[in-house]
Amino acid sequence: ARVPAALSRPSLALSILGMPGLTAWAGMVQQAKVREGDVVVIPAAVGGVGAMAAQLCKRAGAKTIAITSGSEKRRIATEVLGYDHCIDRIDEDLAEALAKIAPDGVSVYFDLVGDPTLTTVAQQLSIGGRVVLCGLIKDYNGDHKTTGPHPGLWITKRATVTGLVVYDYESQRSAFEEEFVPIAEAGELVANEDIHDGLAAAPDAFCDLMRGRNHGKAVVRVGD
């Protein structure tokens, strides 16, 4: 990754100011146009994309709901990244939890995982809700592929559903960096990184990532 000249912490060019950050900005700012009063649900909530997405939404005045699993990830979501609420996808019933936290429905869903989470959250959308389809983590390690909600659900919800490929926003990277590098340098953005030391640690870091064991953006540190 190219490291912006004004950046004092190079690893940020791999996380909140790199492709994950650009992806979050493209999805939440450019496509969903998150605004004050929105209720935004983000799965894979403490990963590189989710962490930046949450902070962008909070800066816009939205209410943020994390979906993750495990006590440590729940702690990071609320105490480090500032999510308003966190739902444990393993220990809680997602539909019931969403109905309780967001009784008027979900305004924006940033889909990073695919089904069954996609369908469950879609059923909780408010009328006119926005969905940004960006990732399919659930499809990475299995033969079953995400099918998603029936099209009739999108119609009933009057939903706006867009697909996000971050490379379409590469031409806007400079504008993104110009805005957010100073904000990061001022300490106003949190970079949640899961750092592994040494190139020999790379295989384990990758396996942890694929198994959902990482607690942030996976970074392998090979030198100073």
Task: Show where each model-derived region lies.
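Glycine-rich phosphate-binding loop and adjacent beta-alpha segment
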Residues: P116-L189, I195, V222-D224
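C-terminal capping/lid region of NAD(P)-dependent oxidoreductase domains
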Residues: E188-I195, P203-D224
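Short helix-loop-beta connector
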Residues: S8-S11, K33-V39, P103-V106
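Glycine-rich phosphate/adenylate-binding loop and adjacent beta-alpha elements
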Residues: A1-L7, G18-M19
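Mid-domain Rossmann-like dinucleotide-binding core that forms the NAD(H)/NADP(H) cofactor-binding site
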Residues: L14-E92
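Periplasmic-binding protein-like
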Residues: S107-L112
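Short acidic-hydrophobic, aromatic-tinged amphipathic segments that line or gate anion-handling sites
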Residues: H85-I90, D194-A201
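Short amphipathic alpha-helix with an adjacent loop that forms part of the alpha/beta core around
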Residues: D93-D104
